[in-house]
């Protein structure tokens, strides 16, 4: 029976990829003082009787490093899009020009940069915890197989493989965090 044990490392990696994907989404929502279309992804507009993402009511562009524009398709929604942005907590003051909403991105002060850097660190720690939980699930499968007759050598081999995958993903999180924090702190 122990010869038949195969740990599904593809499943472990797929689940860890999900944690990394969530981290990237959280990082994208952090405003770094540089314009990006992704910073508006969490903003929802009350349009046509339902909450709708901004990119479904207009075209989002980044014409300059510190400017985002939204070309709203339905003139009747311009006010609702403006209101959604003001209430989003992004700290951006929309300026109207017909059906185009311009969003000048203000510089971040030093205190706000430090705050955002800490938030990025918290997001990274949540991702690390997710990775470690997935690692623990893999290790539990190996321990169960050991109880069912898996040899100690095979157990060590599988545990080493799970640890190597975990280390690789944790390093990826640390690298992404360092990049994001450098981006946030850049003036």
Curated annotation (Swiss-Prot):
Keywords: Cytoplasm, Protein biosynthesis. Pfam families: RRF. Its main location: cytoplasm. InterPro entries: Ribosome_recyc_fac, Ribosome_recyc_fac_dom, RRF_sf. GO terms for cellular component: cytosol. GO terms for biological process: cytoplasmic translational termination. GO terms for molecular function: ribosomal large subunit binding. It is found in: Cytoplasm. The keyword Ubl conjugation does not apply. Gene3D superfamilies: 3.30.1360.40, Ribosome-recycling factor. Belongs to the RRF family. Responsible for the release of ribosomes from messenger RNA at the termination of protein biosynthesis. May increase the efficiency of translation by recycling ribosomes from one round of translation to another. This is Ribosome-recycling factor. It comes from Roseobacter denitrificans (strain ATCC 33942 / OCh 114). The gene is frr.
């Amino acid at each position: 029976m122990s010869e038949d044990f195969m740990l599904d490392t593809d499943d472990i990696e797929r689940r860890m990829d999900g944690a990394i994907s969530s981290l990237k989404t959280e990082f994208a929502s952090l405003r770094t003082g540089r314009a990006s279309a992704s910073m508006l992804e969490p903003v929802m507009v009350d349009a046509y009787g339902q909450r709708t993402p901004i990119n479904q009511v207009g075209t989002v562009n980044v014409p300059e490093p510190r400017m985002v524009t939204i070309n709203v398709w339905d003139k009747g929604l311009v006010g609702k899009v403006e209101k959604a942005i003001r209430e989003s907590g992004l700290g951006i003051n929309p300026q109207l020009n017909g059906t185009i909403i311009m969003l000048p991105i203000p510089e971040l002060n030093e205190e706000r940069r430090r705050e955002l850097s800490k938030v990025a660190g918290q997001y990274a720690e949540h991702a690390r915890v997710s990775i470690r939980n997935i690692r623990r699930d893999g290790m539990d499968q190996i321990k169960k197989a050991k109880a069912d007759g898996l040899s100690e050598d095979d157990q060590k081999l599988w545990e080493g493989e799970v640890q190597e995958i975990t280390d690789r993903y944790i390093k990826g999180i640390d690298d992404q965090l360092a990049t994001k924090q450098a981006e946030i702190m850049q003036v």
